Every structure is written in C-alpha cells, then in structure tokens.
C-alpha cells in the first residue's frame, strides 16, 4: 500500500511539471531568454497585427507576419529527491538547451 502512495506523489509531481508552458514564463525567465533569443514567440505580445517585445521595451513594434517569430521550447534538467515519504522535484534551467521549432 505504501508503494501506491509514493507512486501517487510522484505522479502528482509529474502532472504539475506537465502544466509548464512557455506561453506564461516567469518574469525573470522571460527577461533572461528574450535577451538571447529575441525571435521566440513567447517574447512577443501581438494585437491587431502589431507585435511588441515583452522585454525589450525600446524595440519598435513589428508587423506580426513580417518578423521571423518561432515557437520555442525550454528544456530543464530535473531530479527527484526522496525525503522520507515526500518526493521533491528540483529543476535547473540550462542556458544552451533552447530548442527552436520552426513552423510548429
């Protein structure tokens, strides 16, 4: 029975990780990534065909389909730590592990 409670905790942790989306990055992560990969779609907010960079405020607006915006994904390296009956997840952001998915 104890095995199933551990399994439930582990699955709950995995479920919370699946909820991560680059559409809603934390502000400090958004600042970091958008300094280096300015063409990632998550760095831009678009309305009525005009897009403004969320981080680089001095950058001028661009037309939505005239700037090469790509769908990007950020990958993290995670490890699971068991502390008695509780599992914790620790993730580190890897700077060199941003994958661009062109035309996704």
Swiss-Prot record:
Keywords: Early protein, Signal. Induction: Expressed in the early phase of the viral replicative cycle. Transmembrane segments: none annotated. InterPro entries: ASFV_fam_110. It holds the Pfam family v110. Residues 1-31 form the signal peptide. It comes from the Viruses. Disulfide bonds: none annotated. Belongs to the asfivirus MGF 110 family. Plays a role in virus cell tropism, and may be required for efficient virus replication in macrophages. This is Protein MGF 110-2L. It comes from African swine fever virus (strain Badajoz 1971 Vero-adapted).
